Amino acid sequence: IYGASTNADRDSSGAIVEEGSIGAFNMRVGDCFNDIGASDEVSSVPGVPCSDPHDNETYAVFDVSVTSYPEGEGMSELAFESCMQRFESYVGKDYESSSLDITTMYPSVQSWAQDDREVVCAVYDMNAEKLTGTAKGSAL
């Protein structure tokens, strides 16, 4: 079948060793992936080995602990603030002086109704340069 996406292959430690699709609910800390273009809802991302040039790296995955979906931009703000709190311990440099920025994936109103509570935090280069290697402990 042409054009069919395959899942990213992982080694025994869980690191991606061959590029392929990673489901939005299967993201792991340390996963590197490329951009998919502008989209409100993400079901999967193109995962790549971190040794290959890539756009983003997942540095935190967690469930939000609020009991109801925040109004307006509340979920976006909650996800970003929560990701900021986890940034320095992964990258090794505080957010304000880093050359990396944060992107988040978080529940939509629709996925919240299906018990989705997961937030994914990822870093990318502010100048839209490709990253090579892991951002973990890089102090970029």
Please name every model-derived segment.
Residues 1-140:
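Primary mode marks residue(s) on the alpha4-beta5-alpha5 output face of response regulator receiver
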